[in-house]
UniProtKB/Swiss-Prot annotation:
Residues 24-264 form the ABC transporter domain. Part of the ABC transporter complex MetNIQ involved in methionine import. Responsible for energy coupling to the transport system. It is an enzyme of class 7 (translocase). It is found in: Cell membrane. This is Methionine import ATP-binding protein MetN. Belongs to the ABC transporter superfamily. Methionine importer (TC 3.A.1.24) family. It comes from Corynebacterium efficiens (strain DSM 44549 / YS-314 / AJ 12310 / JCM 11189 / NBRC 100395). The gene is metN. It is a peripheral membrane protein. Keywords: Amino-acid transport, ATP-binding, Cell membrane, Membrane, Nucleotide-binding, Translocase, Transport. Its EC number is 7.4.2.11. It comes from the Bacteria. The keyword RNA-binding does not apply.
Amino acid sequence: MSTPASTPAPDGSHQRDHHPGTRVEFRGVTKVFTNNKNTETVALDDVSLTVEPGEVIGIIGYSGAGKSTLVRMINGLDTPTSGALLLDGTDIVGMPEAKMRKLRSRIGMIFQQFNLFQSRTAAGNVEYPLELAKMDKAQRKARVREMLDFVGLSDKGRNYPEQLSGGQKQRVGIARALATNPSLLLADEATSALDPETTQEVLALLRKVNKELGITIVVITHEMEVVRSIADKVAVMEAGRVVEYGSVYEVFSNPQTTVAQRFVATALRNTPDMVEEEDLLFHEGRLFTIDLTEDSGFFAASAIAADNGVSINVVHGGVTTLQRQSFGKITVRLTGNPAAIEEFHRSLTRTTTIKEITR
């Protein structure tokens, strides 16, 4: 697979495919829908959020959290009831449709259900937005070949969607989204219809898009594993609000809200559930679940406890490395000198989060 180099624009000029990416900024955006009975539904509630050029941000939340409304705002399919939405410093709220159409040419989008034309080949699907852009035929064909090669489908150009696997269809969708040389890519539940192995392949391709082409990527998902695999930052949404925002490491290692904690737990099973706790409590000793970070003090406290007659066994949990930093939770069973166990507990209370598991 090759990396696209330069692309002829419809006017014949050449554009570099690697660019700084688009900056996206929400400023106090609220969206209220009113039905025919004048009942109001708040889909977005005072959302303020900034995505820097070249970043990959994961927007995560359960159904009804406001994720899809957020992405529809970015490509101009919905407009805020109040607030401002800026792309590269330009407020697009109230922008005339002609200007909005031009702006959309800088935005690519991929979907959960691929949205391919069944009557067109893979190459024909990738070519479609170039036809709309009135690109010269020879240039279109060259660009299609370039894009199919970039996504690893150089031998599938003549295949129709029904002849492709789910992962291949999504690759065609990505190639089509990239065909017009966008600076922003919106991925709306792009891996939800794929099996785990294919999901990782598609995420690897999106990482390649970001790293090699410099494109800003906004990933809408309800799967924390997707965020963990690809994102630099994560925004957690609930009831139309961004309730938590930070680097992937910050949110995974120390989630502050209940909804964020639930999402993190689906990706990192480091804490025993109720059934596992009951099994562990059958045995002698005291059980503690401990947050591990590079400065948690666990290993120093463990060494002191061991020197004072305490046996320490790890019975559950694990350590994860994200963004070159390690963190995790472990559950340990301590037996031996009661006073030394209590000192171990007090010591870690000062440096990290430690919780005793009791009946």
